[in-house]
Amino acid sequence: MKDSVIRKLEGLLERNEEVLALLSDASIIADQERFRALSKEYSQLEDVVRTFKSYQQAEEDFESAKEMMEEDDPELKEMAQEEYKATKEAIATLEAELQILLLPKDPNDDNNCFIEIRAGAGGDEAAIFAGDLFRMYSRYAESKRWQIEVMNTNEGEHGGFKEVIAKISGEGVYGKLKFESGGHRVQRVPETESQGRVHTSACTVIVLPEVPEAEAIEINKADLKVDTFRASGAGGQHVNKTDSAIRITHIPTGIVVECQDQRSQHKNRAQAMSVLAARIQAVEDEKRRSAEESTRRNLVSSGDRSERIRTYNYPQGRVSEHRINLTLYRLNEFMEGDIDCVVEPLIQENQADMLAALGEA
């Protein structure tokens, strides 16, 4: 490993010890904001520090094995050769892990996220597929013990959704789901199709990180147009009696957010503002990314929401992830929320892209 990388890792090791000492300081414990910030930093350093310590130990074992190989005792020499081979492999594995751990972190990866699913081409079948995708992500969230909260729905006439927006809360949510943004295409025979012909429909998925209140960009109230209207859909006697639904338009960007799933206008407004903040932040982030990465290839996280990223072929039981040329014949399990078989390779591909970019720098 390069000396510059070793020096960086040694610096992180020192910082980890400093943070650990600070966390036991009474004045820090009394300052909850500082204590939380340091606790978060300690948590972020934990993996790289543990891996670097394992690397240091493997290096020591490797040097010891080399010395033992000079011994005259044949049995001892054979043991040393085995140890030499094992530690050499361990060092290579740990070096690769450390390279990944040292990659720049997306500050949003640990955030909660909003997921927006919209039916595209395909009419009723697209809306039904949007419902299937929402169920898939809901099942995935359940498997991770994340919380999912529906923010707004616009139901299809024959089932599913023309649009559904939900908030998913939990550990590392955005980091796992951010590569789901893009065009999702389905090929299957609709239930209403009497000739048995395969139809193609599409949905767009957008995943946005929730912006923590402390980091939220300031939205000028004068830039907002707020409309109230009566909620539609299920809800018993309450429906259509009060203007509880909210529509907020951000005039400078033209972004419009609606929320009507809560009975309280106050709650709908709060939810709409949190979605609006996430969308405005996403626009700002996209501008910055475009400027920074105009000359850099970034296959997975290009963020082009119109780009077709995945095809779900029901007759063949196939899922094809086009960005990494991955095809799997396990559609049923996938639609039941078992999507890590695609989520993890996408994360790994992004890491490989980042490593390649660092190598070119």
UniProtKB/Swiss-Prot annotation:
Leader sequence segment: none
Location of the region described as Disordered in the Swiss-Prot/TrEMBL record: 285-305
UniProt entry tagged with the keyword Glycoprotein: no
PROSITE patterns: RF_PROK_I (PS00745)
An MF annotation (GO) of this entry: translation release factor activity, codon specific
GO cellular component: cytoplasm
PANTHER family: LD18447P (PTHR43804:SF7)
Known function: Peptide chain release factor 1 directs the termination of translation in response to the peptide chain termination codons UAG and UAA.
Name listed for the protein in its UniProt record: Peptide chain release factor 1
Naturally occurring in which organism (per UniProt): Shewanella halifaxensis (strain HAW-EB4)
